[in-house]
């Protein structure tokens, strides 16, 4: 199984120990960042490639915190 296939399987099984650990660590890291943060590469490279992402100049990726709840 290739690396992209392995990552894809991890995202499908969100309740696995590995995925729970990754999400917990990332959640903590994201809370330490500013509301709008420029990232060097996508969090899910296999999905980004499927959606047309290329690691060329001109592609800029930001992670933006969105408030949840309320009306």
Swiss-Prot record:
SMART domains: Ribosomal_L15e. This is Large ribosomal subunit protein eL15. Gene3D superfamilies: Ribosomal protein l15e (3.40.1120.10). It comes from Brugia pahangi (Filarial nematode worm). SUPFAM superfamilies: Ribosomal proteins S24e, L23 and L15e. Keywords: Ribonucleoprotein, Ribosomal protein. GO terms for molecular function: RNA binding; structural constituent of ribosome. Belongs to the eukaryotic ribosomal protein eL15 family. It comes from the Eukaryota. GO terms for cellular component: cytosolic large ribosomal subunit. PANTHER family: LARGE RIBOSOMAL SUBUNIT PROTEIN EL15, RIBOSOMAL PROTEIN L15. One of its GO terms (biological process) is cytoplasmic translation. InterPro entries: Rbsml_eL15_core_dom_sf (IPR024794), Ribosomal_eL15 (IPR000439), Ribosomal_eL15_CS (IPR020925), Ribosomal_uL23/eL15/eS24_sf (IPR012678).
